[in-house]
Structure formats: structure tokens, C-alpha cells
């Protein structure tokens, strides 16, 4: 199957698919999309996204998801700055600014797009007014004094919750910022683990908050890298307090814990690591379903099975494709009514393994029930950056409340999909 739009410069080929259909594809002007967010204004559905290999952001009208339309693109900082991450809520857009090639992978910064001849970058988080959805207006800029921010959380209201590299720290910590006056954002509190401050001895494995610091009521769920999964009590936002911490030991890449998402109604959480090294050179990565019935004692109930290629595939293992193979992002609703809740069906991007869908009704026996894997990209959409082999690298995912699935890849544009399998309920 091949789908292209009038705006597309290349088509998307379907290599494997089960219980997932291809709805549309848009090249976004050869700008691979990464983190996505959404708002609905006056009956129109707007998707906001940052990009790999390009500084700045794009707004896509997906009111008709079968015909996505780019309605605005604007530039961000031009030198050595990632603008990958976005959040939208209550008419505000939060965009992260971060030095390309941070502490995690400094030896390969150039492969991520860092230009060593210009050793400067922009950092922090920008606050925009998007009540007029096609006319973003900059309201304020929170600066960290360090490398900037990565994956942040904002669901509306007074506070944004940042995974921030602050001045004096080796890696990302948790920072709560008051944006009631967006022109003058103000830090309220911060929380870090042992060894992150530069004036204290480093730990053997440096921890860093990947984020987002996912807030559910008065709890903040922190995917804290090699420090594991951290749960904080933020009933007093000026004094975050540790509730529990779950170690993943030596499992996973150098990244460690990548995502920690609560499923409040089920007293569960989803914990993931992220594949970092190509050609399966990480310690085994995992996605675990956690029992949170006693929040002071998190307990892993099961680990999702590793994807196996179908008979449609031309290889016996995704690790043979090259690039990265392993978990990356899951859909996170961020308490937005335009986004789908996470119920009994878990959606997960898996780099070379494409998109994987899991039935998690029985948390002790999760099973894969669907997938979508594209063919190899037909061209690189930037200089010869990562992956070193031109293969699919599904990165991020967002699902709207209508059931349409949006995914991004390092060398593809926006792909729109739809689940066609049985209704598992719980959403």
C-alpha cells in the first residue's frame, strides 16, 4: 500500500501491519516530526509538533485526518538547539529549548546535528499564547542557566513541570515553575537525587530526569533515568517529598527509566526504558506494568514481550534491520480532553520495530495484538545523521479522542494511523 498527499515529497510504504490501517501521510516539507501536542479551537483540530534536524515548529490542521494540512511553520533558535518538545493546554504552548547532544551522548553530538564551530545554544522553555491557534505569540522565556529542558509537563493552570538542566548540575532535575505571570516565570522548587550537583561526588551511574514529570493530582511521577522510577508528593509545591523509588538495576540503556505513567483508576503505572545504542548494544530494555496499590512499594507485575517480525517481514529479527531497536514513547494524554485516555490498549513506538499495540487487560499477561511497521525510508531528510543505516526509527506517538494515531520518525514526516482491532474497553 502507498499513500501520498499533494503536499508529500515521498510516499510511505507499509511493510507490516496488523489491526492498524494507514490513514494519511504528510512529509511536512521534509521536516521529521517528533514530540506532538494538540488543541481543538472552534471545531478545528490542531496538531503542534517540533522536529528532528530542523529548528522550529509546525502546526498541522488534522480536522480531517485523512487530509492533514500544514497551516503554519515558524523558526526557532538556529544554532545547536533542539526544539523537539512541545506541550499545549488552555491556550498556552510550552516549547523546550535544549543544547544538542547533552551529557548523555556528548561523543556523538555531531551526529545529532551539533556544530562544534559555533559552541553556543539557546536553553530553557518558551511560553506562547496560542488562543489564536495559527498566531503563536511569545509571552515569556524561562532560563535554566544550563543545557536547557527536555521533556516537560503542562496541563494548564499555574505551574509547568520541567526536566531541566539547571546551573550547577550535571544532568536534568525536577523543577516547578510558576507561569501565572508568563512574562516573568518564577521557579517555585526543585528536586534532585544524590550525585547530580557538581559540588558533590558523582555517582557511578549518573541519573538524569528524562521526563515528563507527569502530574496526577498531588503526585509527580518522574522517569529519573538511572535513578529509576520516582514518585513525589507535591501537595506542597514548594517542598516536593519522596514517596517511593523503584530501581531497574542494570536493565536498560544508559538512559535508564524513560517514562513513568500512572494509570490511576487501575492503581497501576507503566515504566519504560529507551533504546539508545544502535545494533542492539544496550543492556536489555524493557516496558513493565507496575502495581501501585501501595504507592510506597511499587512492584513490577510483568514485562511486555519483545516484538517479533511477522511473516510479512524480510528479516527474522528487528535487531537485524540496523538502527535502534527497543522501546521509546507511549501515548500520554496529559489530562487533555482532545486526547485519548490510556485504557486497556497500550500504544508504544519501538524504533526499527515501528508501532506496537498491547492488550494489558491482564497486567500479569500482556500480549501484543497489533503493529504497524513502514518500509525503509527512501531518502535521508538531513545530512548523514543518525541512524547510521537508513531504516525506520519510530519515535513519538499521540492519539486523539477520535482514535486517530499520529507518529513520527527521524526520516519520515507525519504518519496518521487508526486501530482496527477489537474494542478492549477501559479508555
Residue map of PLM features:
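Feature marking well-ordered beta-strand scaffolds used for ligand recognition
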Residues: 1-427
